[in-house]
């Protein structure tokens, strides 16, 4: 069982375990040793980050650890997470590292890894890394210590890759687009790419100060962007999160469309064009029941996975699927990217607007979501509330009541000490009762 790694790398509050400079140094050394263990020649790693203040500290600590084991480090600076996957492959690196806590507040940070193929590491590799981190590793000989070098054009390389995923003749001339970059990693790249495609760009969340990432902006807080869309009479809004691997879309009325709606649009469009590999979409257990029904009506399959875009990608690779994602806005288009890419997904939504000549509001609501209720229960370290008898009894009773009229999902968060209790049903009484009963049982088990 992994102790250090969660569903998306190592994450926590900066300067608190495990996100300390000392731990980042140990992680860098362990990862460096792991990825050059076959021989003693010098290898290469790329490191990207978002705009958090603590990113400087972790960038330097990781660089020290990696170079101490003989890895040459290529520093990309602030770039979207998908750019790290791209650059790992294009720079022929042995490893890619992204320093980010994604949509979390500025005081948090995280470290996630990409293998030489540009894909996130498997659970098995992370277990091996944890053992090395705990045990410590021997440094390289003095003559084999690595070097560090800055790569100044990473965001431009990323921009060209994103644009290459679109039809060659697609232009956004005359389209007024609000782009909310969450004061994060895409604050320069996203507006530039939209401008290059011909859009009239209205930027929001493009003034990072190290402390304002995801604060009152971005995909998890799209209200300000929605107000901007309406106030400026914009055609559409695109909201990214801090590391730009998530997206939500805002139509011209200020209504927000989540990842499920975007996946529904792309899946139906790709299926109609014969581009949907495997005839199915890959999504997590959190995706709405309404999405499943929408796809079924169109003869499109739905493959569900655990929560986390890495598990979506794993299933896509196993089954030969090329479209997947999460309700939260991670959209993975594996013909073009190795991980969720919020900007790329947003641009493909714009491409559908242009191709069909339709408003955002005509495309952003593909299906009527089944009412969904989600509640979180915090627990303390060492507690295992889901194993308690009263919790298991409450779950069984709730599932019995929902049978055929909805669904219930209970899971432990992979990034926080939370138990997430979610249910879906058109019956509001049944919906609330199912969630409340399970939540009460979990809370009792944590006392």
Swiss-Prot record:
One of its GO terms (cellular component) is cytosol. Keywords: Isomerase, Magnesium, Metal-binding, Phosphoprotein. It comes from Ruegeria sp. (strain TM1040) (Silicibacter sp.). It catalyses: alpha-D-glucosamine 1-phosphate = D-glucosamine 6-phosphate. Activated by phosphorylation. It comes from the Bacteria. Coiled coil: none annotated. The keyword Isomerase applies. The keyword Magnesium applies. The lineage of its organism: Bacteria, Pseudomonadati, Pseudomonadota, Alphaproteobacteria, Rhodobacterales. Gene3D superfamilies: Alpha-D-Glucose-1,6-Bisphosphate, subunit A, domain 3, Alpha-D-phosphohexomutase, C-terminal domain. Signal peptide: none annotated. PANTHER family: PHOSPHOGLUCOMUTASE (ALPHA-D-GLUCOSE-1,6-BISPHOSPHATE-DEPENDENT) (PTHR42946:SF1), PHOSPHOHEXOSE MUTASE (PTHR42946). It is an enzyme of class 5 (isomerase). GO terms for biological process: carbohydrate metabolic process; peptidoglycan biosynthetic process; UDP-N-acetylglucosamine biosynthetic process. Mg(2+) binds at residues 102, 241, 243, 245. Binds 1 Mg(2+) ion per subunit. Catalyzes the conversion of glucosamine-6-phosphate to glucosamine-1-phosphate. The active site is at residue 102. This is Phosphoglucosamine mutase. Belongs to the phosphohexose mutase family. InterPro entries: A-D-PHexomutase_a/b/a-I, A-D-PHexomutase_a/b/a-I/II/III, A-D-PHexomutase_a/b/a-II, A-D-PHexomutase_a/b/a-III, A-D-PHexomutase_C, A-D-PHexomutase_C_sf, A-D-PHexomutase_CS, Alpha-D-phosphohexomutase_SF. Its EC number is 5.4.2.10. The modification Phosphoserine is found at residue 102. It holds the Pfam family PGM_PMM_IV.
